[in-house]
Every structure is written in structure tokens, then in C-alpha cells.
Design a protein with these regions (language model features):
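Eukaryotic low-complexity, non-globular regulatory regions
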Residues: 1-4
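Short amphipathic alpha-helix that is part of the acyltransferase structural core
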Residues: 9-86, 91
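A broad, low-specificity signal for short, low-complexity segments enriched in glycine/proline
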Residues: 26-32, 42-46, 78-83, 112-115, ...
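Short secondary-structure junctions and interdomain/linker hinges
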Residues: 40, 44-47, 217, 241, ...
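Residue-level signal for alpha-helical context at structural boundaries
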Residues: 51-52, 158, 170, 228, ...
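Acyl-donor binding region in acyl/amide transferases
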Residues: 87-216, 221-234, 240-241
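Long, contiguous binding/interaction regions
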Residues: 240-242, 246-249
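Short, cationic low-complexity segments
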Residues: 252-268
């Protein structure tokens, strides 16, 4: 799958790289994703990673996940990635990654069905103009459509460099507009200390994308000290996917893409 990157008028003199989204099929593909994750999480954001000496971000769950990659078509460089853990593979792993941060017992009836967890989402700085995350959502939407996924969930991370001011503001907004029903809320295993909310909400792009799709914030955030972030648990009932985004990412994209480009996701 390929899509042109759209630049502002002042950037039109620059070549416009094309992007494609695909599932990793080789160990080298997965390694490229782990290298990008290291560059973003450790070098850019200062996360403390157990695998940092190897120059990658790798953990136990990687071996059980599908890895979705966004590549430049000219250089084949991986510029975006996320990983997908399906319910059957979570059973093989012994748990979902989110269970290391949240008590998910209220969600177990939903997660016994066809659910996916996404995580470790990152985009190269040069592609944070919407193109990189857009391609990831395109791939995720097609994966969900082809595998008949009912629920998608994962964590959206908020930096704690400000002592929790921004996450406090975001949660105040979420409690008013996006909070999941009580029966679908999770409990954090490590609570945040109270913080004075920031004067202005600065919604991270990933969280903003989740909420535009119609996702819920499913409870209070969890502190992740290794990454120095607060993780907000997000739950999306795919059957309630925002109609406009479903039409754009799923119906429209599947109709326009050649069969050869769609088959890679279907085979996962």
C-alpha cells in the first residue's frame, strides 16, 4: 500500500517520498522495527530499556506479535511501526502486554472474542505530519476488517516530564467526553500522584487518532517509570467505529488497493 505525503506549500520544492504499509515477514523486518523503537523511545524520549545495549527495543511479547511497518518506497527505510497481539497469541504468551500495567478482569468477556492489542507505536520525526500515522491506521483498519476484529485496545502514552500536568488535563477532558462505561473500565497497577492540570490540553497525535475513531478512555492512567510516561488505556469497539473514519480507512482503501497489496495483510 502506498500513499503520497502531503506537504505545506513551502515544502513543495522537496521530493515527496511515497510510503507503503506492510506486515513484517522476516526477522530482519522485525529488527528494523525494533531499531526504530530504540531511536524514538530511548534516544529521543529517554526510556530505560533492558535491550538498550543492543541498540534495539525488544521485549518478551515481540515474538508473539505481528509487526506492522511503514516504509519509504524509495529507500525502504522503516519510518513507522506498531505491533499487533491477537487474542490467540496472547493466550500463547500467557497474557496481553497491557496486563503488566492494568487489571483487565472486567474486559475478559470482550477479550475472549476476536480482539487485538496494539502497542509500541512510533513514527520517525520526519513523518509526523500525519502521513506516517495515517498509513499505520490504514494497515490496522485493513487488518481488523480482514480478521473480523471486534475490539482493539492498547495504551496511549503521555510524557511525565511536566510532573503529570498534561495527563491530568487530558484525563479531566476524557472524563467529560470519552470515558468508557463503568463495566468496561480497567484499573491501573501503579497509580499516578495527583497533579495540577495544565492550562491547555495538548492531545498527543496517537491518542487524538484513537478518540477520533470513537475509542473510549477505559479508566485511570498507569505510571510507567521505565518510559517516564503515564499510559492511558484505550478501548475501541470496532462495531462502533466512527462512520466517517471507517469509510475512509477501511471501505475506501480496500476498494482502491490492488489485490497484491492487500493479500499480505490477509495472510497474517
Amino acid at each position: 500500500m502506498t500513499a503520497a505525503i502531503h506537504h505545506d506549500a513551502q515544502d513543495l520544492r522537496k521530493p515527496l517520498p511515497l510510503l507503503r504499509v506492510e506486515l513484517a515477514t522476516t526477522p530482519e523486518d522485525v529488527y528494523a522495527s525494533q531499531r526504530l523503537r530504540y531511536e524514538i523511545f530511548a534516544k529521543e524520549q529517554g526510556a530505560h530499556l533492558e535491550s538498550a545495549r543492543e541498540g534495539i527495543d525488544r521485549d518478551y511479547y515481540d515474538d508473539y506479535c505481528h509487526h506492522l511497518l511503514v516504509r519509504r518506497t524509495d529507500t525502504h527505510e522503516v519510518v513507522g511501526s506498531t505491533r499487533i497481539l491477537t487474542t490467540p497469541n496472547a493466550r500463547r504468551a500467557g497474557s496481553f502486554y497491557s496486563e503488566t500495567e492494568f487489571d483487565l478482569h472486567k474486559l475478559f468477556p470482550q477479550l475472549r472474542g476476536n480482539a487485538i492489542e496494539i502497542g509500541r507505536t512510533c513514527i520517525h520525526p520526519d513523518f509526523r505530519n500525519g502521513a506516517g500515522i495515517g498509513m499505520l491506521w490504514l494497515g490496522l483498519a485493513q487488518f481488523m476488517e480482514m480478521h473480523k476484529v471486534d475490539y482493539m485496545f492498547g495504551c496511549a502514552s503521555i510524557s511525565m516530564n511536566d510532573g503529570g500536568a498534561q495527563v491530568s488535563a487530558i484525563m479531566n477532558d476524557a472524563r467529560l467526553n470519552n470515558l468508557a462505561p463503568e463495566t468496561l473500565r480497567v484499573k491501573p497497577l501503579m497509580h499516578l500522584l495527583p497533579a495540577q492540570p495544565a492550562a491547555k490540553v495538548a492531545m498527543p497525535p496517537l491518542l487524538k487518532a484513537y478518540l477520533k475513531l470513537g475509542a473510549w478512555v477505559a479508566g485511570e492512567p498507569c505510571l510507567d517509570p521505565d518510559f517516564n510516561v503515564a499510559d492511558i488505556f484505550i478501548l475501541l469497539d470496532v462495531n462502533n467505529l466512527n462512520t466517517r473514519y471507517h469509510r475512509h480507512f477501511v471501505q475506501g482503501s480496500l476498494q482502491k488497493r490492488p489485490a497484491s497489496e492487500v493479500s499480505l495483510l490477509r495472510a497474517a
